[in-house]
Amino acid sequence: MNKKSTFRLLALAGLLAAAPTTMSAQTTEPASASKVVYDFKGFDDVKLLKLFAKIVKDGRRYPTDAELRDAGLANEIEFVRSHVRKRNILSRADRLNQTTYEKRDLFMNIPAGAGRGTGGYPSKEFASDNFSMWNYTNLFGAWNHGLFQAPGAWADAAHKNGTDLLSGVKFFDTTGNPGGVGAEGWMPIITTQESDGTYTYAKPMIYLLQYLGLDGINYNWEASGYDDERVIGFHQALYKIADQENFKNFHIAIYTSESGLTGYTARALFGSGGTKTADLMLNYSGGDFTHQMPSSVSAAKAAMGTTEGLYAGVWIMNMNRRWTSLNTAKECGVCLWGEHAQSRFWSYNVGGDAFEAMSNYQKLLERGFSGGMRNPANRPAVSNYNNNWEETGGNLPLSSFAGLATWIPERTTIQGNLPFSTYFNMGAGSQYNYKGKRTAGPWYNMANQDIVPTYRWLVYDAGTETVSDKISPEFSYKDAYTGGSCLLLSGTDQAAGTDIVLYKTDLTGSTGAIKANVAIKSGKEGEKESNLYLIVHLKNGNVWKEYPVGKTTGKNWEEHQINLTDLASGTTIDKIGLRVKNSDANYQMMVGKLELTDGYTQAPAEVKDVTIQVKEETKTSLSVKASWSVNTTAATTGLVYNDDANIDHFEILLKDGADGRVSEVARTTQWAAYVGNIDLTHAQHNPYIGVRAVGKDLKSYSPVQWTQVTREDASRLPDLVTNPYTAPELDMDADGAKIAQKVRYVERFITVGGTTNIDYTANQPTGGTNYVDATTNGQVLTVEQGTTVTIKIKGYQARDEVDNNHDDLRWCFGRGWIDLNSDNRFEPKELSEGGEQLFTIGELRKGTLDQVTGLKAITFKIPDDARTGDTRMRIVFSDAWFKGALKPTGKFNKGFAIDFRVKITGTKPQRPIPADTHDQGVADQPEGLTTTGITAPVAAPSQLVMDAEALNFTNVEQAWIFATDGSLMATLNHPTSFKVASLAPGVYLVKMQNKNIIRTQKVTIR
């Protein structure tokens, strides 16, 4: 493709970034202190195919636990797998926009998460890509991952909404892009045949995908070879085997340099005579939709009798494209491409802080899909121009775009028997809440993203189909009932009644009375009318039923149970929504739960074989990676779907001591979970991690499987580095991170105008996270309220003759903040608007040379009402091509960050400290704890100490030694010592297991 960098294979940067054990045992931190959370080096596509080929030759379909361990896959495999069955979508015949072609599909050929390798995997990084427009998406490309390594959490989210997610991409490009590679290394693998002519790796690939629960493979094949007869034969063999396996949602997606499909190319790129070869993205022409859409539709029909799987590609670097041409070939699907490591929707999104960025991201997606008004029933006119990614002239990004809903019908999978439930979770949160109160810190997990609304947002005058703008719905991360987000309804003007139609459904009560549970929060003291109503539309009567949610009695979250007494079992509900009555511009209501349930009950299968990996352990915190299996009959494919075990989701629980109070700290639909930085307050805490399954009835629970996580000796653990503002850090999965570590840093920083001033110099790069906490170096800017201050800042100037590049801070935006109200965060608004943003320097997608050639002077005034006392100034630089990463917390892109100490003095009246509007106090214990839990035997911490001759083990039942390429070097049973003479010099990864606790440590053999 034009102007794009070459896709790189997964790197070992994450593995090698942490310091390995050397000869000095006294200074070695324990294995559990490792900050390397994931290790995907075993997920090499060819090695995986060869493993499954061996398994097939042995007459089996999937690997044993021992084979997974020996291949270096065991600790990560459940984070790659999806146990959520892809749900079927309802008929689109009654689609909202009847001018669309009912069967027209959308292929989002973009990254799954931001960054390669670990992008999209569960983490503690709240501000992360949580794509949510599955309600229009048929196929998702997972472009930032190699084959068979797309995150299972994303597959779970996709499958809940009826979307297929490819396992990753194979990249070939010989069109002239730097570093482009051909398919010469791949073709000999896939064209290998047995003596009977069958393809050696065809059945293994299908079995591998079925075992992972992922839906196919993705090709960028801008090189020769795709039309080789053996390659075509292999691809067609995959479809034939998938059909025999009833693997109906298997896909090969491919695009080449071709912008059109012809009778000549159809067999290689699409199929012929009813034999499928691939789903095809027609390459864009000059970045835009090809003019060959109509002829390609004709060629597809001639070859296969259908256009299903044919997509016209467009490069969304720019949204000023030939959208009007899409109506010339309505039977052709649409494919949005862009870009390699993070999607254009994510990279173009901006926000002053993490909350604003995450909220803006959902709104940007909504304008891109539902149209610039964020209402699919009220879309701007179709135009090929003025569809701007960035805010222009006060107009929000994509605010004039017609939206993909103009061409693509909406989709929904909500059908069958009750219950139905949503917490309006979008898969991320600044903290984890349970029933309104905090139980854990920042989190990101797409496997805890609820089924998304069918319509974003379909707002009408009550009881009509007249478009209304009197209520503005949005997802908010400022609060949550359970999880990390909620639905926020805000009034814009007076209205007698406004309907928000959320879900298209085909739901039926099967037994007993039908009830609804709705959690709401107004944030206002005292008893108040919520003016909120649950509305359900009955399929047979074509009528809306309305039920009052009731009053709020205070400012905190409240859950209301509503008896839907006039709905009998067997009644079919085909829409669910909310109605607001008598609203005005001051109306605001948060909705954190919407559940419809009946008397159906059925217990889930029990959880078993829980394994805990301890990560990032400090004296006062630790992170855990938990994985488990389920006590049910194994499927032929080796993959058990949750619904086969009557499981809706899993809950991760925490308690302090065997009899401690229990908290829910995470939910997931995967058979694995990561919980970061569990607060243990002091080294004497005795954490237990529990896992249980929740039934499809949403009220039955399996027994909790408890594991005591024995703490490492506190004297060997590092201190938890605390930063009340949270430390920003370089995104190591983003392109150019290593360059940033070498040449992107602030060399000089001077303040003028204070009672005391700062004069900071750096003589070398920072490296690591590229963040400097200079608040501890003794220098302080002391400044009185109302004083004008000048700062002078210079970035290091890189030179080609010295650094082999000039990729320094000139290519960045820079922005500064001061905490002026002592709330330990940085208000994103500018000083002139009452915020805490001091300045912004740099230009979008350009270099600004004076940021590195001399001291750049910036002047601002400390507000008269700034709070006095110690505070902090933060300056963050982020790449000028990714303005969305320019925020005071979280990860920045190819940049640098630094904090300085500030002391504000004065006697003028001070601005107040903002109140924390979250519910306060200790969270309730989870429901259903009456079921007796099961506690695994206590496992003492595994320890590894290295001397000149051996690796010495303590409390280790099994150990595995891996080279940096993922090769297994040794398997050890009950080891006490291992002679290192058998290992060549280099870095090795040692995984140690005691009972069901795993710790990992790196060692260097010299």
Model-derived regions, located:
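Beta-strand-rich modules
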Residues: 676-702
